[in-house]
Amino acid sequence: MKEKIKLIKGNIVDQEVDAIVNAANSSLIGGGGVDGAIHKAGGPAIAEELKVIREKQGGCPTGHAVITGAGNLKAKYVIHAVGPIWKGGNHNEDNLLASAYIESLKLADEYNVKTIAFPSISTGAYGFPVERAARIALRVVSDYLEGSSIKEVRFVLFSDRDYEVYSKAYEELDK
């Protein structure tokens, strides 16, 4: 389902899609990077909804996701996915990263999302190698889309380097 995947160089907060995925931390308290940008652009409504979720279930475990409204963003929802911190590659990081994408897509299907934008989860402050993360993300998303009603998945990459790495991984997807 590679044809449903688009790569975009830009800022994820500017995307006009049904759902934007946030690279969240397990405490669900806004941080830096993508998380900080989404909270800033979306306004306090997102943090308020996350506070209710925290009160109900604590945080969100690594490899899982929760959904909120999108506040002031041009989306209906924000899906807060918790990717793994890179610890050298021998601590189930690959499976946890794949799970963060899959759980986000399952929530998207549950909420009838047709268009969704992902950042490169775990590759910023969490230190996951971008080449490895791009291959995992694109493979998992492509496989998931086979049985999904989601029409378009955008990977929105902020840096030139991330865009180039994802482009290369995208070209290799069917090989």
UniProtKB/Swiss-Prot annotation:
* InterPro entries in UniProt: Macro_dom, Macro_dom-like
For this protein, the record's Pfam families field holds: Macro
* Secretion signal span: none
Q: Looking at the record's lineage, which domain of life comes first?
A: Bacteria
Q: Which Gene3D superfamilies match?
A: Leucine Aminopeptidase, subunit E, domain 1
* Family from the record: Belongs to the MacroD-type family.
- Annotated PANTHER family: GANGLIOSIDE INDUCED DIFFERENTIATION ASSOCIATED PROTEIN 2-RELATED (PTHR11106), MACRO DOMAIN-CONTAINING PROTEIN (PTHR11106:SF27)
- This protein's name: Macro domain-containing protein TTE0995
